[in-house]
Structures are given as C-alpha cells and as structure tokens.
C-alpha cells in the first residue's frame, strides 16, 4: 500500500473502532463504495452528489439487518465526511482500492459488522445458558469490557442491567398507581367526558388503579441526548456510564438532558467523577451515583438472596438485549446477502 492508501485505511479503521455495534457510519461508507463499483461511478470529490443519497442506501441495509435506522442528528451523521473522519479525498482512495479488489473494502467493512454481531450472540448465549445459581453480573459485564468491538456499547449494557433489576422489582412488589380527581371537578369531567374517556378509561367512581410500569426507551445512538427510562408514575431517568479513560467532561455536557440522571461508574473512579461533576456545575442534576460494585451486590441479592426475583430479572436482560441488538438472532439473512454480493467475510484486509 502507498502512504495515501494506508492513511485512508487507518481512517476507515478509526471509524469502525469508534462505532457502536450497529456500525451505521461504516455501513454508509460500504454502500457508497458498492454503488460506485456496481451501479454508477461516483465523483467522490463532489460530496453533495452522494451525501444525502448515501444515507438512504445505508438505511436500506440497516432496516434489513438491524430493524432500525440511525436517529442521530443530521450534523452528527454528516461529520462522517469531516477531515478527522473520512473526507472525500480519502473516500476517493478507498473507492479506487475497492474497485481494484472487486469489492474488497466493502467485504472488509461487512466482515467487521458480522464480527460485532457474532460477538453479541455469544454474550447473549451467556444469559441463555446460565440460571439464578450460575449467572454472575461481573462475568457478564466483563464480556463487554474485555472485547474492544463491544466496549463502545457498554453504556447500553449498564442501562439494560439497571432497567432489568428496576422493572423486575416493581413487578414483584405489585406496585400500583392510582388516578383520580376531586369530586368538585365532576362537572368539568362531564363536560369533556366524550373526549376524555377516549384517552383515559375512567370508571364511574372517578378512580382508576393501574399496575406500575417501567419502560425503557432503548435503541439510542451515540449522539442522542434523550431519556433512557420512564414510568407511569412520574419517574424519568437517564442512565449514564462514565469512565475516566474518556473525555469525561465533554461526555457529560453532550449527553445529559434528563432531570434525573443516574451515573454508573467503577468504584475506584467514583470520587474523581463526583469532584469533576461538582467543578463543572452538574452535581445538582445527578440523582445518584451507582458503582459497579453496587450493581453486583444487588444482583447477588436478586438472584440468590432470601427473596430472589431471578426469573423476571434474567428474562428482562435477554429481552432487552434482543431489542437493543435485533440482529442477534438465528434467522437473519446476512450470510445470503454477503454471498449474493460476492463478499468474502473471512477477509481480514484489503
């Protein structure tokens, strides 16, 4: 490889490494290269001729294999083509390499996609192959911490772990939520009853009791700043994993938006994170800080304690992983797709 080609490959590898398991941006690059090679040769240096089209090409693949598309802001999606990512000049070099290798760069990208979801399938198998006696939260978390391809998604795993325990506990406790209104406002209800009853099915005694529910929004992207969990009893929480090996302050400012934020971190980093949160003025927005040790202790109680809630807990984890990473299933058509395009997904270079 020439120096120019090596730099283009390093830029692509950087995008792949930074991507979460869904690999939206690498898939967009692969589809640009595919359309250039097989459908119509592109003018790579003229970004406006393929910038928006390439999002549609990417979305078509993502809907097929992921069941969703990127919901990140247009600005976040477009920074794929900035100088510190894959600018048109480097994309042109990749395009030449891709044509010369008969789709080798495309194969390389989709190999990474296949690897990520193969790794995720193995992690899901851990949940399926363990029970309340053998499941260890520390082992489960390390399956992601120790795998570079999945480490970028560790915040989603923490979110799932927190939600699974919270939801199982609310369900097992049998918590209910009551809705009513003062009798002196009965005249107002009667005035708008035909409309209101279509929204809230209120019984004649003006009192409604519902089972408490926790809902996880899920399926978020790296640039999303929204809610993680909400309930029908007023609770709205964002779970945010923080680590000192990242650009912590920037990560906090760009990611926190909910009124109640639960920070998840390593025990050894807790005091430093609290200090930094205080310095940048975010301490008041933090409802609590949960350490990994806390979660492990709570899971031990939930799985093997005096009053276990293991069945609901483990089922929640499995369900939410399948929901967050829907390509983790035995029926996906990815291998047929790769074969039809002539990809060699055993390729380790191009």
UniProtKB/Swiss-Prot annotation:
It catalyses: Endonucleolytic cleavage of DNA to give specific double-stranded fragments with terminal 5'-phosphates. InterPro entries: Restrct_endonuc_II_HaeII (IPR019058). Its EC number is 3.1.21.4. It is an enzyme of class 3 (hydrolase). Keywords: Endonuclease, Hydrolase, Nuclease, Restriction system. Signal peptide: none annotated. One of its GO terms (biological process) is DNA restriction-modification system. GO terms for molecular function: type II site-specific deoxyribonuclease activity. A P subtype restriction enzyme that recognizes the double-stranded sequence 5'-RGCGCY-3'; the cleavage site is unknown. This is Type II restriction enzyme NgoBI. It comes from Neisseria gonorrhoeae.
């Amino acid at each position: 490889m020439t120096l120019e080609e090596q730099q283009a490959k390093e830029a692509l590898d950087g995008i792949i490494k930074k991507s979460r398991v869904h690999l939206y941006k690498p898939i967009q690059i692969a589809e640009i290269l595919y359309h250039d090679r097989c459908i119509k040769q592109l003018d790579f240096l003229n970004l406006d001729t393929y910038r928006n089209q390439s999002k549609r090409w990417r979305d078509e693949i993502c809907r097929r294999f992921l069941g969703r598309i990127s919901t990140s802001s247009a600005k976040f999606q477009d920074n794929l083509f900035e100088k510190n990512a894959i600018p048109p000049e480097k994309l042109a070099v990749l395009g030449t390499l891709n044509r010369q290798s008969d789709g080798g760069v495309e194969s390389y990208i989709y190999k990474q996609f296949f690897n990520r979801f193969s790794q995720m399938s193995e992690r899901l198998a851990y949940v399926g192959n363990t029970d309340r006696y053998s499941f260890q939260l520390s082992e489960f978390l390390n399956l992601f911490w120790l795998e570079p391809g999945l480490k970028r998604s560790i915040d989603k795993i923490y979110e799932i772990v927190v939600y699974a325990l919270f939801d199982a506990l609310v369900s097992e406790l049998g918590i209910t939520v009551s809705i009513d209104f003062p009798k002196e406002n009965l005249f107002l209800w009667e005035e708008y009853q035909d409309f209101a009853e279509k929204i809230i099915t209120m019984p004649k005694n003006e009192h409604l009791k519902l089972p408490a529910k926790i809902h996880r929004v899920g399926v978020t992207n790296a640039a999303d700043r929204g809610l993680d969990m909400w309930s029908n009893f007023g609770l709205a929480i964002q779970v945010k994993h923080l680590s000192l090996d990242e650009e912590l302050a920037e990560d906090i400012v760009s990611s926190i938006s909910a009124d109640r934020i639960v920070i998840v971190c390593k025990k050894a980093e807790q005091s430093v994170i609290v200090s930094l949160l205080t310095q940048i003025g975010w301490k008041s927005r933090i409802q609590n800080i949960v350490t990994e040790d806390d979660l492990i202790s709570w899971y031990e109680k939930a799985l093997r304690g005096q009053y276990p809630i293991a069945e609901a807990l483990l089922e929640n984890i499995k369900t939410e992983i399948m929901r967050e990473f829907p390509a983790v299933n035995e029926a996906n058509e990815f291998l047929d797709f790769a074969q039809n395009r002539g990809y060699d997904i055993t390729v380790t270079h191009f």
